Amino acid sequence: MTHICIDETLISCRNRCHLIIYEPNKPHKYGFLFRIMCDCYTGIILNFFLCDVGINGAETVTMVNACAKLMEWSFHNDIRTTFYTDRGYTSIALLQLALKNKCNFIGTAQANRFQENTLKWEQVDRGKD
């Protein structure tokens, strides 16, 4: 089984190019935004793509579509996979896509993100058997 992490990275650049994105919460504010899929154990990049910015400054590919696009690579190669994502990529649509292709999906779930769907919340008792 393969363990894959999906995340984004901003490669710093201050040139004049329509692909440069402004991210105020990143250490480098301006640069090229890449969505990257890499192996958790080796750190080798398996798949990536450059995010494009539309005319109005919004991304043409949403985070959910970006993650689905990266996940399709492992589905076509028939790899049993566990995907690890951060809070920006976790959604019901991606969970259903992973389930349909018999893959595992681990991500951080925020309570306000899943308002139309109900999730079971269980309190974990620490230190009890």
Regions found by a protein language model. Give the residues of each.
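Acidic, contiguous segments within the catalytic cores of piggyBac-derived transposases
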Residues: 1-129
